[in-house]
Amino acid sequence: MSFPDSYSPDPARYDGRMPYRRCGRSGLDLPAISLGLWQNFGGADVFETGRAILRRAFDRGVTHFDLANNYGPPYGSAEANFGRVLAADFKAHRDELVVSTKAGWDMWPGPYGDVGGSRKYLIASCDQSLQRMGLDYVDIFYSHRVDPRTPLDETMGALAHLHRQGKALYVGISSYSPELTRQAEAMLRAEGVPLLIHQPSYSLLNRWIERELLGTLDELGVGCIAFSPLAQGMLTAKYLGGIPADARAGKEGSLRREFLSDANLARIRGLDAIARRRGQSLAQMAIAWVLRDPRVTSALIGARSVAQLDDSLGALEGLAFADEELREIDAFAQEGDLDLWEGSAKLGSADLPQPRLGARGV
């Protein structure tokens, strides 16, 4: 697949099909559906396929693209490929885009690029990400996870430093517990930097944020962008008949074969039946369900083809749920024991080194 050098986005991209939601108590709106580049945009993938997906997303009103330093594979290649598309297709539209990236998981060899939240790692990683994407700044820079070996005030201090430098217009956190979210928000506020957004995992089979986190974010005025609303692809038609040979669960990766237990498959089939009665695909209903709560600013999806992207964006045509539908969904939308990120999200202040004496916001 090849494309002409010039690209003109669809002039109807802001015609109202894509709703935009205010992110917490900030001045920033995000599209109800954002596109993440965790999978399918790395150096091992077909560049022109990813380019077509990005173009189609923007044509459909998706203005927020989410990355991380180690997205690929190989690490860094998703940012590099996104930078190529930015330069070739989106350069004239940079001010229409919200670009985010993150750091916190392992990235480069040695003690300074491993899992971490140190000042050295976060600032170096942000600089590297900007270079790979060919940008002077990102709109949002995240601490991708809690680092149990680094005091929280050091991690938040690094985010505040990047914000003051103008390298990050906003800052966020991902997979933080409600307790640490409160502490992170207070530390940043003491530095004069608002915490814009939290990015937790959330789906019909992974509902941990409903217990306390959503209420905490609402109270603090922090936005929420839910990643993996399709439970790494489980909440699609792909697994209704078992595990296909080409499925992500059949390979090494984020979707483990044991997640597709008999109990989870029964839940998926039950949810699919409800989706069919609603006139939606299972994926569309799963995304719409995440967005049913106004405290969720955006659902962060992935896509491996333009057709898959279009199907997911079709969720916007059926966001309303009757009370009876929600009760029926609740019978199947139960914890599936598939939260890969709970190791970070369960950490509390007692699990971290104590802040330095005199740390602000403590």
Residue ranges and their predicted role:
Residues W208-A247, S281:
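Aromatic-lined glycan-binding groove of carbohydrate-active enzymes
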Residues Y20, L54, E79, G83-L86, ...:
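Generic structural signal for well-ordered alpha-helices
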Residues D59, D106-W208, E212, G223:
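Glycine/proline-rich, positively charged
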Residues G24-G42, S100-D114, Y137, Y142:
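N-terminal small/glycine-rich loop or linker at the start of catalytic domains
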Residues C23, L35, G50, A57, ...:
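Conserved, mostly hydrophobic/aromatic
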Residues S2-M18, I243, A247-A273, R277, ...:
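Terminal-tail/helix-coil boundary detector
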Residues L28-I33, G61-T63, K91-L97, L135-D139, ...:
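Short, well-ordered coil/turn segments that N-cap beta-strands
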Residues M1-L97:
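N-terminal binding-site loop/beta-alpha segment at the start of enzyme catalytic domains
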